[in-house]
Amino acid sequence: MKTITRLALVFTTAIFSQAAFANDCTVDVEAGDALSFSTPKIEIPASCANATINFKHTGRLPAAAMGHNWVLAKTADLQPIQNDGNVAGAAGGYLKADDPRVIAATAIIGGGESTSVTFATAGLDAGDAYSFFCTVMSHSVVMKGTFALKG
């Protein structure tokens, strides 16, 4: 009986550990009408082949009035991406089309909406500095945070 109990415990622990590990590759981020992300820092284990960001707009205002997106790039590229996003404007989704500096980006969403983006981490270097930010109407001035691979 003890052997069965031990095996059940090992099996249960293995299943829950794998589930927890898989969830480390997915991060939930929120933003509202107050021009801020719910977290200033995102860390993804370096062992994740892909990372997923689930992005939710918790505010009430529509995308045309207070929309947000979630964009990931090297920190050094943040301002140039924002500058090009300003040129693209609302019609271009506040991002230059097919910008190779953008690692990942969500659609622009408004209050009550959600979106997600999944991207490969293989091209990311743990030694580089990365930032996530919102390019809508230069929100990146205050809406930004750091992104890192850990481990």
State what each model feature region is.
Residues 23-32, 76-95, 137-151:
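Extracytoplasmic/periplasmic copper-protein system
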Residues 104-151:
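Extracellular/periplasmic metallocenter environments
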Residues 24-50:
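N-terminal edge beta-strand
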Residues 36, 90-104:
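Short beta-strand and strand-turn-strand segments in soluble, beta-rich domains
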Residues 16-22:
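Sec/Tat signal peptide C-region and signal peptidase I cleavage site
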